[in-house]
Structures are given as structure tokens and as C-alpha cells.
A protein has these predicted regions:
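Flavin-dependent oxidoreductase catalytic cores
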Residues: 1-368
Length: 368
């Protein structure tokens, strides 16, 4: 049996397989509300056989959105539109997960397909972003307002409040986004954090906010349900956040009740030279897994079922996160089932005629 296609359990939650839909921003919301696009986008990946379906980075405050069109969970009105999505995901046998995020200094930007770079200025309908220090991401981005300690406490509370709303919305996994150069990663990295208070300077100070956010979320998130944290293992820049620091952070997060580290990289520097290639981030997931004893997920240029299977069999990671490959082919998990000799029973009954299998279909196989 393929490891990729075997069920996988964390706490009291079992996933259909070890394939996760990585959070991918759709930039298609109004006022942070999920709509038909999000239902079809996420629902089709659930029909396609992935065991865990993550929403895009969902902002915990309005000013924490990457773009004005991002999903949000900073008010109660945003709960109900997400409920119909989680209901549909569960009906397909998948688990619904949500990534909670704050963009920090990388907030108030343009939707990527518009071809514009940098910040949306206030006079263009944007807002002034916030960050650990008044350091812009690059010359095209607005210099952020430095958060004071009271505002930092507000951010911590916003993550906890969003987690409570996520539970009401029907999600079973929460992931804290501390990667890709967004707010929590900005506090981790000396490239973006030059504070001189308890949140800056030393390693202990720079990890403080991530630990406090994680602790606040774990406190309100049910003990029987898993909590993930996404990290960038390295900034890919000299004197930036590095893999050794990530390993130590992972140990601290495990002690706080985190169940899996979702391992990515980069995002704090526009000048980073990233050696992108097949599975280029997997070695970080492996080193974190071995050194900290926590489960890891890996993402980035994983395109073939055999490649994913090899990663799992060689104990480099525990879950495979797929992103662009699932945009190209929402049914990648079902095709992987064919390629790797899986259970042969996860195609929806409504789609069985496409599988060239002459077998009876029971009413219980029909998807709602």
C-alpha cells in the first residue's frame, strides 16, 4: 500500500490520505467574505481526493490582508459563508483546514494579475501597513508603522478570536502562518525586526510573538484537534532567519502543543537567491523532523506521485502539501491512486465512468 494514500492521524483526527491542499490566495473576496469562487475552488480539490483542504491565508484583522480581496475571519459575519464550504469538504470525506495570517508590512498590495508591484497607497484605496520595525519590504512597498506593545497584544488576541470563529465555521485544523515574510515571520527575522524591546534583538525575543500567538490559539482550539504552524526555514539571505533557528523554534512549538510544522522558505527579502528545483524545501522538513521530533509537511515543486511517495518512505516528511500542481490538476490525488496502486475506490460515483472500471456503484458512493 502506498504511504501517500494511507490514512494519517493527528490527535483524534484522521485524514483520508497524506495529501494536503496548500493554502493558495485567490484574491477574490469582498470584505473578507467567502463566495462561490472559494466554494468551487476548494470543493473541487476535495472532490479530487485530497485528504486535507486548506483555505488561503485568512486575515485575522482587516489591515492584515495581503490584498483588499483576501479572505478574512476578523468578524462574525465572515463565519457563515465559510460554513457551506466546510460542509461540502466534509461531505467529500476530506478535512477542512484554515490558515490564519497577518500580512504585516506586506499588506495592502495589488492583486498579482494586475501587473502592478508594491503597495496600494492610501489614495488608491489601500492602507498603511504595520510591522515589527519601520522597514519596507522593498522600495516599492510602503514603510510600515511599527507596532507598539499594546498593538502586539491586540494581534495575539485577533489570532485567538479568529481561531474560535474557525471552529464555529466548521474547520478541524488551524494553521498559524509564520512564513513567507508576513507579520509573524517579520518578527522572527533580523532582516525585518530591529526592535530593542522584548520582541526584538535576541533569538528569544524574536520568537516571542510566534510563541505567544501559538499559545493563545492552542488555548482556544480543542485539544482533540490538530494545530499546525507554517514556517520559512530560511530567509535565503546572509544574517537572516536560518535553519538552525527554525529547528529550535520547532522544539518550542512542539512543547506548546503544535502537531505539525508546515515547512516552506523565503519571503522576507526581495534579494533572496532561492535555488528552486524539485522538492527544494524538503531537506528542511527532514532536518526539522529529525532534530525536533515533530511531524512535518513539505511543499514546493512536488509534482509526481512517485516523488511524493519517496519523500514519505524515506521519512523526510509526514504530509505532502501540493499547490500549483493542484491548480493544474485538481484530480491529482485520484490519478496518484491509479499510479501508485491505491484503493481504487475514492473516485466519486458520479465520475466512475471516466475510470474505465466496470464495477457496480452503490448509492453510498454518491457524493453530496
Amino acid at each position: 500500500m502506498s504511504l501517500l494514500l494511507e490514512p494519517y492521524t493527528l490527535r483524534q483526527l484522521t485524514f483520508l490520505n497524506r495529501i494536503a491542499v496548500s493554502p493558495m490566495c485567490q484574491y477574490s473576496s469582498v470584505d473578507g467574505l467567502a463566495n462561490d469562487w472559494h466554494l468551487v475552488h476548494l470543493g473541487s480539490r476535495a472532490v479530487g481526493g485530497a485528504g486535507l483542504i486548506f483555505t488561503e491565508a485568512t486575515a485575522v484583522t482587516a489591515d492584515g490582508r495581503i490584498t483588499a480581496q483576501d479572505l478574512g475571519l476578523w468578524n462574525d459575519q465572515q463565519i457563515e459563508p465559510l460554513q457551506r464550504i466546510t460542509r461540502f469538504i466534509r461531505a467529500q470525506g476530506a478535512v477542512a483546514g484554515i490558515q490564519l495570517a497577518h500580512a504585516g508590512r506586506k499588506a495592502s498590495t495589488w492583486r498579482p494579475w494586475l501587473g502592478k508591484q508594491g503597495s496600494v497607497r492610501v489614495e488608491e484605496g489601500g492602507w498603511v501597513p504595520v510591522g515589527p520595525s519601520p522597514i519596507a519590504f522593498d522600495p516599492r512597498h510602503t514603510v510600515p508603522t511599527q507596532l507598539d506593545e499594546r498593538q502586539i497584544q491586540d494581534v495575539i488576541q485577533a489570532f485567538a478570536d479568529a481561531a474560535k470563529r474557525a471552529l464555529e465555521a466548521g474547520f478541524s485544523v488551524v494553521e498559524v502562518h509564520a512564513a513567507h515574510g508576513y507579520l509573524l515571520h517579520q518578527f522572527l527575522s533580523p532582516l525585518s525586526n530591529q526592535r530593542r524591546d522584548q520582541y526584538g534583538g535576541s533569538f528569544e525575543n524574536r520568537i516571542r510573538l510566534v510563541l505567544q500567538v501559538t499559545e493563545a490559539v492552542r488555548e482556544v482550539w480543542p485539544q482533540e484537534l490538530p494545530l499546525f504552524v507554517r514556517v520559512s526555514a530560511t530567509d535565503w539571505v546572509e544574517d537572516g532567519w536560518n535553519p538552525d533557528e527554525t529547528v529550535e523554534l520547532a522544539r518550542r512549538l512542539k512543547a506548546l502543543g503544535v502537531d505539525l510544522i508546515d515547512v516552506s522558505s523565503g519571503g522576507t527579502s526581495a534579494n533572496a537567491e532561492i535555488p528552486v528545483g524539485p522538492g527544494y524545501q524538503t531537506r528542511f522538513a527532514e532536518s526539522i523532523r529529525k532534530a525536533s521530533g515533530i511531524a512535518t509537511g513539505t511543499v514546493g515543486m512536488i509534482t509526481e506521485p512517485a516523488q511524493a511517495e519517496h519523500i514519505l518512505r524515506t521519512c523526510q516528511a509526514d504530509i505532502i502539501f501540493l499547490a500549483r500542481e493542484l491548480l493544474r490538476d485538481p484530480y491529482w490525488p485520484l490519478h496518484a491512486d491509479d499510479d501508485l496502486g491505491g484503493r481504487k475506490a475514492i473516485w466519486p460515483a458520479q465520475y466512475q465512468r471516466a475510470t474505465h472500471r466496470d464495477q457496480p456503484i452503490h448509492e453510498s458512493d454518491l457524493r453530496d
